[in-house]
């Protein structure tokens, strides 16, 4: 029998696997889907913001960004807050591409949200955020490894 913690990890892993499957169905890699998803749903972001929000390696995000820039789907602009950082901006071609890729997933998420209900979704989000906050605290305080 699985413990609650194992169920949480299992559900999280399964969700990631399903988003990876969605990316494959949509004809992109998981990291590309997450970058497009971020830009489509959250607007102008930096690579760092995407990396942190979606738990992607900085180099992975950088590789996706380079590919999207090369394909003329994305352009980079200097950040007003920090000139060392670049803001990622979808081009007109990029906006159309991102919508084509991300919209089917957003519609599916919308149908799922309706099935689950707002209250349950809010509880799920709150509990998951709390779990992550407490796990991060534990990690920052140092795990006790015993060989």
Q: What is each model feature region?
A:
Residues 15, 19, 72, 98-101, ...:
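Hydrophobic recognition helices of helix-based DNA-binding modules
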Residues 1-26:
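N-terminal leader segment of winged-helix/HTH proteins
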Residues 119-147:
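C-terminal regulatory/oligomerization modules of transcriptional regulators
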Residues 17-60:
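N-terminal helix-turn-helix DNA-binding core of bacterial DNA-binding proteins
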Residues 66-126:
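Charged, amphipathic alpha-helical coiled-coil/dimerization segments
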